[in-house]
């Protein structure tokens, strides 16, 4: 078990990406893989287009309702965004996401 890595969201540093949108990095692995918690306040929207490059993005909606610029995803939803795809992350009600980038 000594090879396990763990972190608590409340102890993770807060990186403000845009007004009302914060990232809390939980883990970074070899090759750039990373896991983060993304917090989007009610009425907040990503500035510009979020392009998934070099690899895919895996999203699990932990709480609230996430919108990718096209549709809503309620809590409990899983989203796989393939490499090269894009969206505009936002939320009317606010949401918390677990985001995993297997390739960075």
Name each model feature, range by range.
Residues 1-36:
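A short, N-terminal "cap"/entry segment at the start of jelly-roll beta-barrel domains
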Residues 3, 17, 45, 72, ...:
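Intrinsically disordered, low-complexity N-terminal regions enriched in serine/proline/glycine
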Residues 19-21, 83-104:
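Ligand-binding loop in jelly-roll beta-barrel domains
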Residues 22-54, 67, 71-72, 82-86:
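Conserved short histidine dyad/triad with adjacent acidic residue
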Residues 59:
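Structured binding elements
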